[in-house]
Each structure stands twice: as structure tokens, then as C-alpha cells.
UniProtKB/Swiss-Prot annotation:
GO terms for molecular function: sequence-specific DNA binding; transposase activity. It comes from Sinorhizobium fredii (strain NBRC 101917 / NGR234). Keywords: Plasmid. Pfam families: HTH_Tnp_1. This is Uncharacterized protein y4hN. InterPro entries: Transposase_8, Trp_repressor/repl_initiator, WH-like_DNA-bd_sf. Belongs to the transposase 8 family. The keyword 4Fe-4S does not apply. One of its GO terms (biological process) is DNA transposition. It comes from the Bacteria. Gene3D superfamilies: Winged helix-like DNA-binding domain superfamily/Winged helix DNA-binding domain.
């Protein structure tokens, strides 16, 4: 038996190391079952965490990932197969549209409605300055 000296000079004759146990590993199905149980009623998250011996923060992390639809999905990081195709010549035939379709259709009031990719709409008159309209549309595209 080894004897250790303490900070104050006292001798320590016994030293006990307490093991906290091994880390629990839950399968995806177990996690989903625990999360479903935690959603069963008001105040069930804390009780469920205590029942399974996990922290509330871990259970809340699982609950958040389930709400966001991230839980139980496979990771998609990594490489994807790539194919190198031989370069081939494909002739292109130019087709002219019928004469009836060549003229743009004008609305009776001369107004246009432009919808940006983010859903914002701009209604302009037919005499709008194109450069100014482009600046406005670029500005609207940056707004999210």
C-alpha cells in the first residue's frame, strides 16, 4: 500500500477512485422513442430525462433535431460518383417562332408586374428606365 502526503502534511493512507460508469450509447430508434415520450405532456421532458439517466440539455438537443427533421437521417457528406462523358458533336437546329408569337403581348394599361425570386413584386409602367429597374431588382434580390 502506498501512502501519500496531503497538502497540509497529513498522510493519506487510502485513495479511492470512483468510476462514473461507461457512456451510454442510444440507437436512433431508442432516441426517437425517448423523444416521443418526452413530448407526451407538459413537464414530461425533465421526467423523461431523469428516467433514462440523461441530461435535460441532451434531451432538448434530440428534441430540436427531431423538430428540424435532422434526426435519423444519414449524413450526406463525402464524395459522389462522377462520370466523364466523351465529347460529342450534337447539331443544333435553329427554329424560328411563328409570326403571331413574335410580338410581346402588352397589357391595356401599359403596366408590368415583375416577381423577384424571393417573392417581392414590382409593378412598373411601360416607360420605365431599364437601367434603373435593373438596379431596383438587384437590390430586391439581396433582401431576404
Amino acid at each position: 500500500m502506498e501512502i501519500f502526503e496531503g497538502d497540509s502534511g497529513s498522510r493519506v493512507s487510502r485513495l479511492e477512485v470512483i468510476n462514473t460508469g461507461r457512456r451510454r450509447r442510444f440507437t436512433e430508434d431508442e432516441k426517437l422513442r425517448i423523444v416521443a415520450e418526452s413530448f407526451a405532456g407538459r413537464g414530461r421532458a425533465s421526467a423523461t430525462a431523469r428516467q433514462y439517466g440523461i441530461s435535460r440539455s441532451l434531451l432538448n438537443r434530440w428534441r430540436k433535431s427531431v423538430r428540424q427533421g435532422l434526426h435519423g437521417q444519414k449524413q450526406t457528406d463525402g464524395f459522389v460518383p462522377a462520370f466523364v462523358m466523351p465529347e460529342t458533336f450534337v447539331p443544333v437546329k435553329q427554329v424560328t417562332p411563328p409570326a403571331a408569337m413574335e410580338q410581346p403581348v402588352a397589357s391595356p394599361s401599359g403596366r408590368m408586374e415583375i416577381v423577384a425570386a424571393n417573392g417581392r413584386r414590382v409593378v412598373v409602367d411601360g416607360s420605365v428606365d431599364v437601367e434603373a429597374l435593373l438596379r431596383i431588382m438587384r437590390g430586391l434580390e439581396t433582401l431576404r
